[in-house]
Each structure stands twice: as C-alpha cells, then as structure tokens.
C-alpha cells in the first residue's frame, strides 16, 4: 500500500488541527517501543482507495482492517480524494434516527440511521449540501450501527490515506 499526502485547504483551521494531531501522533510513534508501535498501527484507522471496474472508491477501515464505511464509485481519483476530505469535514454531524416514529429532522451534515429492506440497521453520512458521502454495512442491532457511527467519528479525522495496490 502506498501512502498519499492529501491536504486540501477547505478551511485553514481544520488543516491546522489535522496537522497538530498528525505531529502529536508521529512524535508519540517515534518514541514508542516496537510493540507499542504495533499497537498504535493496529488502532489507527485509514482510508483505503481502491480501483473498481467502473472507477475508484474508498473504504474507511478501523485499525483492525474492518470496513466501517464505503463511498460511492467516483470516475476520477481526485474526486475520490475530495470525498475523503468531505468525510473528514462532515463526520462531526449529529445523528438522525429514522427508525423512530416521528423522528426529529437534523440539519446537514448528519448521519442518518435507517433500516433496509431486509430489516438491518444502516447509516449514511450526508454532507452539508445533502449529498451522501459514505454508507455503512448492515448491522443486526441499532446499538452496533450507532457504534459504527462513533468509529467513523473517531477514525476519519486523522486516518491516513493509502492506495490498495492489489486492486490497481
């Protein structure tokens, strides 16, 4: 896998905050023992950019490699990388639970929790403009789905971006 250096200056504050987080993680990583580094690598999320038959997409993976959220298929790599930045920017959104009757509508950006046709719980992350930028797998319980949202919020802001060379 190859690491990308992706910094879009959507807002200077968020870029500065991300840089500070990255520097803190790097300095902690440099002073850690080999076993501590392995644990740190295991706990860090990452965006994995993959080529498909029809374009390019990304998966947000937890430190253990489990896919937390997936994007749509983009026609260009630059659009895919913009989608990653959009997830980072919008993952602070509130949760709108559409499984509850008479639920309260929440302003974008937001996570929408819903049930699919097979009765599984899923979430989708919508950007400020209302576009869906990431979706989840199906979960058997609402608690697991809400946990998935928390993992997106935890992993996305500082996740590194790597290219999946196996599918290239």
Task: Locate the predicted segments by residue.
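Aromatic (phenylalanine/tyrosine) cluster motif
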Residues: 4-8, 29, 42
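Short, positively charged and aromatic/hydrophobic N-terminal segments
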Residues: 16, 20-31, 36
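Intrinsic disorder/low-complexity detector
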Residues: 41-53, 89-117, 159-168
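A structural feature that tracks compact, well-ordered secondary-structure segments
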Residues: 46-52, 57-74, 83-87, 110-116, ...
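Mobile acidic interaction elements
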Residues: 61, 81, 155-161, 165
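Short, tandemly repeated low-complexity microdomains enriched for cysteine and small residues
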Residues: 68-75, 95-102, 133-140, 161-167
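Glycine/alanine-rich phosphate-binding loops at beta-alpha junctions
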Residues: 78
